[in-house]
Structure formats: C-alpha cells, structure tokens
C-alpha cells in the first residue's frame, strides 16, 4: 500500500490480472455472539418483505445486514430472509419484523458465533451439484423488486421441468453507509461513491444435477437476467455495477468500474506485468486486456 499504491488499488477488485498474493495483513476486532439466521416463508408476504427491505436499505442499522431471496425448489416455492446483527442486544426493528413474518416453514433465528452462522450457510449448499452464479444490479426500487417476482415465476415454467432444479433470486442491499465505510479505509478498483447507493446486487443462483441440462439452464437463466436488466432500465433504476464474485463468464464486470478505473487497471497491468503473463497464461477470471 505504501510502496506500490497503484498495484494495491488494482489488486482490490482487479481479479487475477496482476499477480499472486502470498500474504495478507488484516485488521481484526473482537466479536461476541451475534443475532441472526434464516426464515423460510411462502410468497404471500413478498410485498411486505420488499417494503421492509426498502426501509432497511435507506435507513440501515450500522450493526445489521440483510439478504432477501425469492426461491424455488421441488420442496419449496417462496421467500427466504437472512438477517444478522453484530449487536445481539440492539437488533433493528426492521430486521426483527422481517424475521417474524408468517407463515414460517423454517426459522433458525438465534444468538450464535460467526462461525456457527457460516457453517449453517455451508450446510444449505452441499457439494456435488452443478452450481452456477449469474449477477446484475439495480438502484433501489420497490417496483423493480415486485415486478422481478413476476419474471422469476415466468422463467420457472420451463426450468422446473429439470429434475431437482433449484433457483434463487437473491437481493443484497449496498447502502450509502457501506460505501462510505469502505472508502474511509482505502480506495479500491470498484470506483463506487456514496452517491451510487443505495443499490442492490442481484444473484441468480442456479443448481442442477446433470451436465446434459447445462445448455438449457445457462440459456434460460441468462434470459431471466436479461429480462431483469430490461425491467430495471425501464424503471429508471439500471446500474452498471456487476459484482465479480457472482459473475458468469459473459458478464461485463470491468465495464461497470468506469473508464477512469479501467485506465488505472490497464496501467498497472502494463507496469507490473509488461509481458502480459497473467493475461495470456493464467486461465480463468476476467481479463483487463479484453476491455
């Protein structure tokens, strides 16, 4: 950070374009038991859940976080709320309200350690399946979230014919407070400012069993993502940001960083990897040379 600030910035969001990190130095903090967990419900309270999501995203709890998902599996069609607070004694009323929604098929809300919550999430995602991620984002909009449920349900008409298929449309709010806190501890390549918030990262998480279904699944979920982006544009809520860790290989991740950030990434690549080793030889990832 002190000796090569341009490389430090590039590594924070630049994917595998610049080198191999062999050492991390991280600030740590103590953490007592947290409050949180998940609640599984049906689709009937979707409107009220979206309304509470809007409240949280515009007036966030500094100690809380929230994920709201529309889900389909052979066992359940409905919604999932994952809510957490690092201050178990002072949980946001909005989070409490969302986790008392009815009906409930499963409720894991409790006080637990961070590792306990991490294990719970891992247990919900067992290995051995063909798990694909697709992503987009939009500026916070109640109408987008309500209408998105309709296009999600339309996509399922064809997709649910696939044996044991599971699809989730997951909404993760990125608040102004989150962006401000991130910028205070150092710049990165994402090029986000508080004025970009609140916006919402969308993850389409798709799980199927057989390779013979790959082409159908990819095509249909890409179509769902395209319809979602068209909806967001029509509602005046489109966002160019694409979260790299959720991005399918066709996603224009770096384009969402903006021209200034792209120029800095390309300059760092030319300076620290003049032969283009990480562009030509290292497989996978998103290559800055392709932008």
Model-identified regions with their sequence ranges:
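Soluble FAD-dependent oxygen oxidases
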Residues: 1-291
């Amino acid at each position: 950070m002190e000796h090569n600030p341009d490389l430090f910035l590039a590594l924070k969001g630049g994917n595998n374009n610049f080198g191999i990190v062999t050492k991390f130095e991280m600030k740590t903090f103590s953490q007592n038991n947290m409050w949180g967990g998940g609640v599984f419900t049906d689709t009937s309270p979707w409107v009220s859940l979206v309304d509470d999501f809007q409240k949280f995203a515009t007036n966030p709890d500094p100690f809380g976080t929230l994920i709201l998902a529309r889900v389909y599996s052979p066992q359940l069609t409905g919604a999932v709320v994952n809510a957490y607070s690092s201050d178990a004694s002072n949980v946001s009323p909005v989070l409490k309200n969302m986790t008392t929604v009815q009906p409930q098929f499963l409720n894991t809300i409790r006080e637990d350690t961070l590792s306990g919550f991490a294990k719970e999430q891992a247990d919900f995602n067992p290995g051995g399946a063909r798990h694909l991620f697709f992503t987009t984002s939009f500026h916070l909009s109640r109408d987008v979230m309500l209408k998105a449920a309709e296009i999600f349900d339309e996509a399922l008409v064809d997709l649910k014919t696939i044996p044991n298929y599971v699809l989730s449309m997951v909404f993760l709010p990125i608040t102004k407070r989150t962006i401000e806190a991130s910028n205070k501890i150092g710049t990165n390549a994402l090029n986000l400012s508080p004025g970009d918030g609140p916006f919402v990262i969308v993850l389409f998480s798709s799980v199927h069993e057989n390779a013979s279904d790959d082409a159908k699944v990819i095509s249909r979920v890409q179509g769902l993502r395209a319809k979602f982006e068209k909806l967001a544009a029509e509602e005046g809520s489109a966002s160019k940001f694409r979260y790299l860790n959720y991005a399918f290989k066709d996603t224009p991740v770096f384009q969402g960083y903006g021209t200034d950030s792209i120029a800095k990434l390309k300059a760092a690549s030319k300076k620290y990897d003049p032969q283009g080793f990480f562009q030509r030889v290292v497989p996978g990832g998103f290559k800055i040379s392709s932008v």
